[in-house]
């Protein structure tokens, strides 16, 4: 009896139950993993999507800001008062306006300036203004060059040697009133004048014949000086009363 009882106990083997994870097929595992990855992607993409929607400003507000920037494209830095005015027009906060201008100066402003340079109408106007300015400057410089000659211009003229009569201060006779003198001058032989090439700073050489006319004048001067010296000597020799 004991042997018979032991026999069935030995023949019965315990049945092992597999866990649910082990009983699932590989296809089910793949679908679960892909589903988990998709859920994770949705969670990660959700904040970015919200952020993009938050950064988009209304089209009317952007147009107002772009118009202001185009008018002030050479100095696109609005002051606090101007920011307040734009905030009232666009219904945006001051922070949004400041951020928009920071980004617009890097992305939009260069295109605005380049578009203005490439515009043929604006370039034609600029060329006309430059041509008009050049004409005005040319007209202003013409009177200065062709103005009346002043004393400075007269002094800058070259000095030519004057005739002998004009150098001594004599009055030249009228050729019409004295025809006989004119004939006499024509009949007289021309004097030879020696011309020497010298530097402008050195005085012109004068022939000794020109000094002959002043000999009598020099004698009178010497006589007057001598007479004055004699009178002075006589005054010194006279005794005091």
Swiss-Prot record:
InterPro entries, per database record: HD, Homeodomain-like_sf, KN_HD, TALE_homeobox
An example molecular function term from Gene Ontology annotations: DNA binding
Residues annotated to bind DNA: 48-111
Record field: compositional bias (Polar residues): 21-39
Function of the protein: May have a transcription role in testis.
GO term, biological process aspect, one: negative regulation of transcription by RNA polymerase II
A Pfam family per the record: Homeobox_KN
GO annotation, cellular component aspect: nucleus
SUPFAM superfamilies: Homeodomain-like
Disulfide linkage: none
Species of provenance: Gorilla gorilla gorilla (Western lowland gorilla)
Entry similarity comment: Belongs to the TALE/TGIF homeobox family.
Residues covered by region (Disordered): 1-58, 126-209
UniProt keyword terms in alphabetical order: DNA-binding, Homeobox, Nucleus, Transcription, Transcription regulation
Record CDD domains: homeodomain
Subcellular location as annotated: Nucleus
Taxonomy, superkingdom: Eukaryota
Protein name from the UniProt record: Homeobox protein TGIF2LX
Gene3D superfamilies: Homeodomain-like
């Amino acid at each position: 009896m004991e042997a018979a009882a032991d026999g069935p106990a030995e023949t019965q083997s315990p049945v092992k139950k597999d866990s649910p994870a082990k009983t699932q097929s590989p296809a089910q595992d793949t679908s679960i993993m892909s589903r988990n990855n998709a859920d994770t992607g949705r969670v990660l993409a959700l904040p970015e999507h919200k952020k993009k929607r938050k950064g988009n400003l209304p089209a009317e507000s952007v147009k107002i800001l772009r118009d202001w920037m185009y008018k002030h494209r050479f100095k696109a830095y609005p002051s606090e008062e101007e920011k307040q005015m734009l905030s009232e027009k666009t219904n945006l906060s001051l922070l949004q306006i400041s951020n928009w201008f920071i980004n617009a100066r890097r992305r939009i402003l260069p295109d605005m300036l380049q578009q203005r340079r490439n515009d043929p109408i604006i370039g034609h106007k600029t060329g006309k203004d430059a041509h008009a300015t050049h004409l005005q400057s040319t007209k202003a410089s013409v009177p200065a060059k062709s103005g009346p000659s002043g004393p400075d211009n007269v002094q800058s003229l070259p000095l030519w040697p004057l005739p002998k009569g004009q150098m001594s201060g004599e009055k030249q006779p009228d050729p019409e009133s004295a025809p006989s003198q004119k004939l006499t001058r024509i009949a007289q032989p021309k004097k030879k004048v020696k011309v020497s090439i010298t530097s402008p700073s050195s005085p012109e050489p004068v022939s000794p014949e020109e000094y002959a006319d002043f000999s009598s004048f020099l004698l009178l001067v010497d006589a007057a000086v001598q007479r004055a010296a004699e009178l002075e000597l006589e005054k010194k020799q006279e005794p005091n009363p």
